[in-house]
């Protein structure tokens, strides 16, 4: 298992007055491992109050946080999910406050019980079967390959791709080369 410190205690963030009142009395920890581009905090330790997660996105990541809020609202009709406690959107920022789901992450279970990998895979498969059992005709969202590639190309054309963030194998490659190599791997191209 990785020995990365998965979260770090941090000071309370200042937000707008409506949200600040809801967050008074919580201890804060910042997530160190997410890859979404958002800043994520776990809020805990407030007596008689649920553990919460606060996600903040800026710029294009604010759109992703907004999309997550919309999808959570929709998906609650099909399965238990975190409750959205608060959502704030400004032209450049989005803040999403949700309850935490009780339990442990797959990573936490694997750290505690290294021999449980097969059980974790089985549990994830059950969850994915449930998710995939939702009829596609009920889903109002589009995130197919064509849509995502168009988003990626737009980001590339607007200079929003950070080439210094490429993996070791593609370190030093120009963005256009990564784009061309990725297209060679696409199914049905």
What are the functions of these language-model segments?
Residues 3, 7, 116-119, 170:
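A general boundary/transition motif marking the beginning of the first structured unit of a protein
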């Amino acid at each position: 298992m990785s020995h990365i410190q998965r979260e770090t205690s941090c000071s309370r963030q200042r937000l707008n007055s409506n949200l600040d009142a809801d967050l008074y009395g919580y201890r804060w920890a910042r997530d160190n491992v997410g890859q979404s581009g958002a800043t994520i905090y776990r809020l805990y330790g407030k007596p008689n109050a649920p553990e919460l997660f606060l996600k903040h996105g800026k710029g294009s990541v604010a759109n992703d946080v907004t999309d997550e809020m919309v999808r959570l609202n929709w998906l609650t009709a099909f399965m238990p999910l975190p409750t959205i406690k608060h959502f704030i959107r400004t032209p450049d920022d989005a803040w999403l406050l949700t309850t935490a789901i009780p339990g442990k992450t797959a990573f936490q279970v694997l750290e505690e019980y290294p021999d449980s990998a097969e059980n974790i895979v089985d549990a994830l498969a059950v969850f994915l079967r449930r998710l995939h059992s939702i009829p596609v005709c009920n889903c109002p969202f589009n995130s197919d390959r064509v849509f995502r590639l168009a988003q990626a190309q737009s980001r590339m054309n607007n200079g929003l791709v950070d080439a210094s963030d490429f993996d070791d194998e593609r370190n030093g490659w120009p963005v256009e080369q990564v784009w061309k190599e990725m297209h060679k791997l696409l199914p049905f191209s």
